[in-house]
C-alpha cells in the first residue's frame, strides 16, 4: 500500500494507531500523532510499548476467566477492554449474535447504574423518549438493536447513540455492519469466526477494536449463561 501511495522505501511506520508520514514535497518524515486520552485501547496496550505479540481472541469466555468488571477482551493482546467513564453503549447485531448477553455483561461491568434497554428498535414511544431524555442529561444508557435497524435509522435514540456514543457491532463481517459502524470493519473481522456468538468490534470515535464478549455471571436464581443470546 505504501508503494502504491508513492512513498519511498524505508518510511513504513507500522500499523499502530496514529502512525503516519509527513510529506512536504522534498523530505519524508515518519511521525506519531498525539492520541486523545480517552482513545480506546486494551489494558496491555495502555501499559506501554513492548514486543508485539498477537494473541488470538478466545472463542468462549466467562466472568470467572477475567478480572472483575471485565465485559469484553480484545485487541492484539486479547486483554480486557475499557471505555471512558460515563460512556453509553449501543450494541448492534443480528439475532443469535449475543446482543442481550453483551448488554448484561456491560451492565455488570459498570460502576454506575445505567439505563438498560434491550431491543431499542422494538421499543414503544415512551421507552424511546426515556432513552433520549437520559442521553440529553448525559446519563449512561446501554441499549441493543438489530444491525439493519442501526444502519438505516437516521433520527431518534438509535441514531443519537450510533453517532455520539460507543458502538459494539456483533458479527462485524455480516451485512450491513459496515454501514451501521460508518467505517469498514474488514480489518477486525475474523473470517473463521463470522458467526461466533459474542464476537464483535468496538467502534468508538472513528477507531475499531476486535473483541469477544464475556459471558456474565448469573443473577440471583438464574442458571449460568452457557451461550450468548
Model feature map: region roles:
Residues 124-137, 155-158:
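Conserved Walker B catalytic segment
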Residues 95:
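The conserved Walker
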Residues 102:
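Hydrophobic positions on the alpha1 helix immediately C-terminal to the Walker A/P-loop
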Residues 105:
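Active-site signature of alpha/beta-hydrolase-fold catalytic machinery across serine-
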Residues 112-128, 140-146:
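Conserved P-loop NTPase "ATPase switch" module shared by AAA+ and STAND
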Residues 91:
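Hydrophobic anchor at the beta1->P-loop junction of P-loop NTPases
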Residues 98:
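Conserved glycine(s) of the Walker
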Residues 1-86, 152-229:
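Phosphate-binding and hydrolysis-coupling loops of NTP-dependent motor/remodeling domains
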